[in-house]
């Protein structure tokens, strides 16, 4: 028997990827597409490549008969929309940032709004499947992690958990394709602005910073402050992070490989690459995999960690489906058994 799901925000890039994945999921029926601006428009007219013969509607959510609702909506939308009564009727996976951070003051600092739903904020489960699997299985509201966040946390988590690095030395240099900025038209994302160009943005201000710090702090069991700098690169999709940290003791590469293996050997979507094989975005493109590898610089006594994901899949829609699978006791990789399209 299939579960019935709905999607708000299916017209965006992450929303379209969600539709594409769910159409190939054997245990899911997409029965509702919500929109306030595209009511009556058939989804195939918007995305001719996607064979979903369903029109956008604008119904009161309390009227819907769904098992699960995905929210691929802008920030600040779901914080006002969700309530306990709705969560009694259906499970929710929110792809926005509205329920990712536990401290309401972080929303005032980083997102410039006062969170209106602080009780639900405390009850939401952070949907990083490899870290919080058991909590996700029991959750009614899952906050799907950000794309940079997913790649950064997964790449560094074992080092923080084992406390083998100087936490104050951590620097994350991240690069993302343009789809990470969303589908809305912006001058800075026009072809002539991004083609043959690489640029940093939101220095010391990127909103994924507190998310990364919060969950690496949980791993380290102490407050973490790190440096995160994102860059926009001229490609459609993909994230590559290069992270640097000072080692606290003299460790060899095999020592660190043993640590990563300890934490990730049983995870279906994390690939610890062989020595000397460094992650590339094309190896994870259109897949739900996270590729990780590292090198120890004996000269500087630093570990250099590389991580790569597809920002729209493992960084958004694929991870949302992975969360859904856990919430409904499906196989974790159900509907996600696809590899990179080189």
Swiss-Prot record:
Gene Ontology, cellular component aspect: cytoplasm
Active site: 147
Pathway(s) of this molecule: Amino-acid biosynthesis; L-arginine biosynthesis; N(2)-acetyl-L-ornithine from L-glutamate: step 3/4
Pfam families the UniProt entry points to: Semialdhyde_dh, Semialdhyde_dhC_1
Record GO terms (molecular function): N-acetyl-gamma-glutamyl-phosphate reductase activity; NAD binding; NADP+ binding
Keyword annotations: Amino-acid biosynthesis, Arginine biosynthesis, Cytoplasm, NADP, Oxidoreductase
InterPro entries: AGPR_AS (IPR023013), AGPR_type-1 (IPR000706), NAD(P)-bd_dom_sf (IPR036291), NAGSA_dehydrogenase (IPR050085), Semialdehyde_DH_NAD-bd (IPR000534)
CDD domains: AGPR_1_C, AGPR_1_N
Location(s) in or outside the cell: Cytoplasm
Coiled coil feature spans: none
EC number from the UniProt entry: 1.2.1.38
Major place of residence: cytoplasm
Family (UniProt): Belongs to the NAGSA dehydrogenase family. Type 1 subfamily.
Name this polypeptide is given: N-acetyl-gamma-glutamyl-phosphate reductase
Gene that encodes the chain: argC
